[in-house]
Amino acid sequence: MGVYNTLALESGGITGPEMFAPGEVVVDENGRMTGLLKETACTYMWDKVIYTEEEFMKSFKAANDILLSYGVTSMHDGSFYGEETIGLYQEACRSRLIKVRMYNLLYHAYGKKKTIEWVNRFISTGIHGGLGDDHFRLGHVKILIDGSTSGPSCATTEPYSHDPNLKGIQLYTQEEADDIIIKAHNAGFNVSAHAVGDAAVNVILTSIERAMAQNPRPCRHRIEHCGIINEELLARIKKAGIVPIPNPGFFNENAEIYVKYYGDRVNYMFPLKSYLDNGIIAALGSDSPVIEADPMIGLYGAMTRSDKCSGTVAGQGQCIGIMDAIRMYTYNGAYASLEEDIKGSIEPGKLADLVVLSENILETPVEKIKSVKADMTVIDGEIVYER
């Protein structure tokens, strides 16, 4: 989400809430725009700002340096920012301006219409996911089904606990999701979707199930966030072999408001313990820049699910231990990008990507995990960061 003044709204051509899905352009009691834009209304405005190649490259370098300082050696990037950025990303990785290995989801950050056009163009080329090398790879086709847990704007089947009139924002109908997901699946792509609320998770699950029924083939589809689910959705995720990508670091920032917004549903929110108990391979991510990219925040969130300000715990029964959390960040992350044969664990024959931490996190008290630092980051056997 983002806040824009009157001049920015006028310059961007946003004239009223009717231009987008209900709830994306926030209005006051008199129906006037407040300046708060959510989801595709917000990303629509991103397209109105033009960056130079030099500005892009500077931002790539800055992001790379931040990730290396956190000990991150591989990342999954959720979107491209305009057609020109795919080539810039590739060049930055080729020249090693970006040293962190990049697995890129095929999603256009400037909204639904752009994403559909973007995905159709990739499908029409005849290529499919996995194109690239160990430093820059094109991966899953991705769409964005709903909003966020913190908005709150994720699409839920039941109203929010704090407001019986709200059930979030759903950006794709079932038919629209079916069209793009089945098309991408048939073209040989693995598919993914940003789906947070249980209503949104049901949409993407249904599309994937229909795609797999029409065209059974080896695949490794995934759901980004997969925030609020239930036993029925959990069983369907397992049956389809889907990889959920939960973000436990969110609890560090939002556990208190999660309890307010979703009530007892927090017991199946980013349900890491349930994934483990059911043999579902889930990979943890930060969702940076929504929160910091520091994996220590995610590890802490996975183990405590507690709010850093109030101490509120959201769904304590879903807490997991340190070794399981580490595996979800490392091996499972590689599994989510179909690269577990070359990275995700330290063993002979795999890429020499390592991090040396300031202390042994297997012995560090849970309450101190967030203070652990990366002392050294190594990629391809080269020291790329030292504290």
Pin down the residues of each PLM region.
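His/Asp/Glu-enriched, well-ordered alpha-helical/loop segment
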Residues: 58, 181-192, 196-221, 225-226, ...
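Short, well-ordered loop/turn elements at secondary-structure boundaries
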Residues: 98, 132, 137-139, 145, ...
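Short secondary-structure transition/capping segments
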Residues: 5, 10-16, 117-128, 150-157, ...
